[in-house]
Amino acid sequence: TMMKVSHPIVFGHCVKIFYKDAFAKHGKLFDELGVNVNNGMANLYEKVATLPTAQREEVLKDLHACHEGRPELAMVDSAKGITNFHSPNDIIVDASMPAMIRNGGKMWDANGRLKDVKAVMPESTFARIYQEIINFCKWHGAFDPKTMGTVPNVGLMAQQAEEYGSHDKTFEITEDGVANITDLATGEVLLSQNVEAGDIWRMCQVKDAAIRDWVKLAVNRARNSGMPVVFWLDAYRPHEAQLITKVKMYLHEHDIAGLDIQIMSQVRAMRYTLERVVRGLDTISATGNILRDYLTDLFPIME
């Protein structure tokens, strides 16, 4: 979890499902105490600590009983018994996934031992890049920091481009209905989507000037460094199909003779980049905003 609005909501669902039996039994009490598990188990333990001894011990016993029939949880602090459900920002995608991969796909268990781990990420598209690097490492082994290539990034982020989950355009829908994106100047509805109560609904936007600038930066970086540049864009995602059209258009504004510039879907781009990294070759990644966040942690941590 790293996205201020959307991820804590998903995180709260995970906590409630993992501790389902305890919530079924003590849900009313938790509501009375004002527990909000979107803030993690730390919030729950804090509130439970205020209960009379007998009641507190019963609740804690029921919470701990949930661990008996469940998979072990990756630990943030084995000595203190702090699991990754303690707080939504203890284990975050951009920092924790690379560390886990660098550790051979392992994280710490309750006894302070490294064990194989299953990572569960709250989205589907960019999770695949991590699957790709995990598969690659299973086949090729760990990267060697002495010989591996580097992957500088040019991110699409000007003018709040593709802001994600941490801004004022992400909502938890309160009732069933329709979400519209409306042009305030004309009243025209640009996009409509059916939504249900509890949905997380996000709008993202990119301004034309930001795309133009992004293409220029990528071309300049390629020319100055001599590295190939890969635009990580998937023609099957409607938003990115629009970006691809604009990228191709704005590439014509530059002298790209002799430059190696390609557009690939995220998984292909990751595979292509890793094939070069392992041979000590450098590759520029030109990506949207979320991948800028992920990749600028992933490759430096590996290196």
Describe each region flagged by the PLM:
Residues 1-13, 21-246, 250-303:
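Extended, well-ordered protein cores
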